[in-house]
Amino acid sequence: MKRAYIMVLDSFGIGSSADAERFGDAGSDTLGHIAQACAAGTADKGRSGPLHLPNLSRLGLGKAAEASTGTFPAGLDENADIIGAYAHASEISSGKDTPSGHWEIAGVPVLFDWGYFKDEENSFPQDLLDKLVKRANLPGYLGNCHSSGTVILDQLAEEHMKTGKPIFYTSADSVFQIACHEETFGLDKLYELCEIAREELTEGGYNIGRVIARPFIGDKPGHFERTGNRHDLAVEPPAPTILKKMVDEKGGEVVSVGKIADIYAQVGITKKVKATGIDALFDATLKEMDSAGDNTIVFTNFVDFDSAYGHRRDIPGYAAALELFDRRLPEMLSRVKGDDILILTADHGCDPSWHGTDHTRENVPVLIYGPNVKPGSYGHRETFADIGQTVAAYFGLSPMDYGKSIL
């Protein structure tokens, strides 16, 4: 029985890539800087001491990071007994965004340039805004700028609740984000507005990767919080991913846990499981692993590393989340049996010690575990697509156009 379990620790980079200078990210290192802060005692909020990741260390995380940066992460166990295959991979996609990273993991790198809304203020074309107001029958809009999603709620959510005007904002990523109150504006109405925005952006040729619904609750600044009902409307990958090939060529099952289905525009997904928060995502993943049959991919995105800690530049929070994941990892490892393979990786970096609030261009870990996987170093992988090619070879799918099988 063949089953592949792919876990994306969203934004868990292990050192800036060779091309990071082009993105202003040379020197960024999500894992390394978190580990440094923990070792120095400056990340003791809600946790304490050096970064403690014994199970990830046994899979080769520390050694993969050392190969990426030349420095072993502070506090991790340099003498861990390695039980998995490990490597570090660089991205060849043109951007450092979520769809690019995930599509490349699935064998389809993004070699074109996404469209971006680059102006910090008055970010969106007036023609686009006018069409959204007219089609969705809106009283107007708020925002129209670059912002962190939590900051903009404290600034504009009260006015949004009074006026019914949705909050439009963007970032350095190829995104059009819409924040609305779940109760006063309504979730269904927000989703409908996002569908309209997706249509207008596509028809207008803006080449924007995602429209993101950002629902929230609360009644005053400091008390507003985003809910788990986020919904991403992505464009479809430009070529068949391993997920689509798994369904088309093998009649296999592809189970999305978390936001995976949204990232791939629902293409190549046979089952969607919603869950919010690391523990809930972990629980849902374990449940799907328990029921997975032959020719199944279970694919989970652990978004909180990125959304709750990376973008918010919260080093102690990120460290605590990694330690939580590591504590629960044995539950996952114990379910990997026979011919199964488990792959742990990331889609980009988001160094919580870095300036700004955006992603960082970094190498990512590729940690592979299974009873038939030979432990040890598998070096530097020149593209995330090596993961997709590995999965294609494992299941006997037709080869992907990019990447080399790792195993």
UniProtKB/Swiss-Prot annotation:
The keyword Manganese applies. SUPFAM superfamilies: Alkaline phosphatase-like, DeoB insert domain-like. It holds the Pfam family Metalloenzyme. Keywords: Cytoplasm, Isomerase, Manganese, Metal-binding. It is found in: Cytoplasm. Binds 2 manganese ions. The lineage of its organism: Bacteria, Pseudomonadati, Pseudomonadota, Gammaproteobacteria, Enterobacterales. InterPro entries: Alkaline_phosphatase_core_sf, DeoB, Metalloenzyme, Phosphopentomutase_DeoB_cap_sf. This is Phosphopentomutase. One of its GO terms (biological process) is nucleotide metabolic process. Its EC number is 5.4.2.7. The keyword Transmembrane helix does not apply. Mn(2+) 1 binds at D10, D347, H348. One of its GO terms (cellular component) is cytosol. Mn(2+) 2 binds at D306, H311, H359. It comes from the Bacteria. One of its GO terms (molecular function) is magnesium ion binding. It catalyses: 2-deoxy-alpha-D-ribose 1-phosphate = 2-deoxy-D-ribose 5-phosphate; alpha-D-ribose 1-phosphate = D-ribose 5-phosphate. It comes from Pectobacterium carotovorum subsp. carotovorum (strain PC1). Belongs to the phosphopentomutase family. Disulfide bonds: none annotated. It is an enzyme of class 5 (isomerase).
